[in-house]
Amino acid sequence: MKIAVLSRNPRLYSTRRLVEAGTQRGHEMVVIDTLRAYMNIASHKPQIHYRGKPLEGFDAVIPRIGASVTFYGCAVLRQFEMMGVYPLNESVAIARSRDKLRSLQLLSRRGIGLPITGFAHSPDDIPDLIQMVNGAPLVIKVLEGTQGIGVVLCETTQAAESVIEAFMGLKQNIMVQEYIKEAGGADIRCFVVGDKVIASMKRQAKPGEFRSNLHRGGVASLIKITPEERITAIRAAKVMGLSVAGVDILRSNHGPLVMEVNSSPGLEGIEVTTGKNVAGMIIEHLEKNGGPNQTRTKGKG
């Protein structure tokens, strides 16, 4: 197969590993800088050009679209879909998962366990919003944040009110979530490919920190997940419409709670921690399921 990898940087671990794994399995791998691909949206022959030439003959595309280029990246991916190229994850699913609030609304509708989450616009509603999530301590998250940036733990009601007011004053969209104390600053990253959890790891926040993101100094270790956690991760990825996803789960007193469903999960942490060839499994999934016009939306965007 001829497979495009949409990535800003061919030197990134995840991009390198996907290219390696694909090449090892006999595929032609082409890394395309997402922001340098440009489109001709013609009615009969949609095209993508790259460095002055049209991109042609691709069987599949692997999007590694960073959060900051979601809008343009999804447009490029959608154009590939219009051309009948099979995407590892569809543009609609990626756009959906990048909107944290929309994701939680979709997951809650399907009855998937979530931390109690509040969202409000007016400062007048702050006291009731705080009560809604069972009061302090609570967590405040900027909707557009990634890698643990813009996530604040407020220990007291007073602190929570000040932080929420500050964010609202800056016109930042935020959500307020109950703090799951029993998780002890740890979460579980379940790596879903197709309808299986192919690898999972525990991420423990460093002492004095509650954010377990590896970018924030969290430490990863092996973990055996429960059947309930496995089912939750697979269902969450399915609800979002993602074939490949990193589902972050907290262990709470009332079962697994989904924190986030990531459409472009990094491979380094999970491969190094588990020793599994995750990149190879992703390519294998493409081989089994990919093909012209095989997208769930059948290439209609």
Curated annotation (Swiss-Prot):
Keyword Lipoprotein: no
Residue positions binding ATP: K141, E178, Y179, D187, R211, S212, N213
Cofactors required: Mg(2+); Mn(2+)
A GO-annotated cellular component: cytoplasm
The enzyme's E.C. designation: 6.3.2.-
Positions of Mn(2+) 2 binding: E260, N262
Xref: InterPro entries: ATP-grasp, ATP-grasp_RimK-type, ATP_grasp_subdomain_1, RimK, Rimk_N, Rp_bS6_RimK/Lys_biosynth_LsyX
Coiled coil: none
ATP-grasp domain residues: 104-287
Pfam family, one: Rimk_N
Alphabetized UniProt keyword annotations: ATP-binding, Ligase, Magnesium, Manganese, Metal-binding, Nucleotide-binding, Protein biosynthesis
Listed GO biological process terms: protein modification process; SOS response; translation
Chain residues that bind Mg(2+) 2: E260, N262
Cofactor annotation remark: Binds 2 magnesium or manganese ions per subunit.
Binding site for Mg(2+) 1: D248, E260
Annotated positions binding Mn(2+) 1: D248, E260
GO molecular function, one term: metal ion binding
Gene3D superfamilies for this protein: 3.40.50.20, ATP-grasp fold, A domain, ATP-grasp fold, B domain
Database matches in PANTHER family: RIBOSOMAL PROTEIN BS6--L-GLUTAMATE LIGASE, RIBOSOMAL PROTEIN S6 MODIFICATION PROTEIN
Protein family membership: Belongs to the RimK family.
Protein name as annotated: Probable alpha-L-glutamate ligase
Organism: Pseudomonas putida (strain W619)
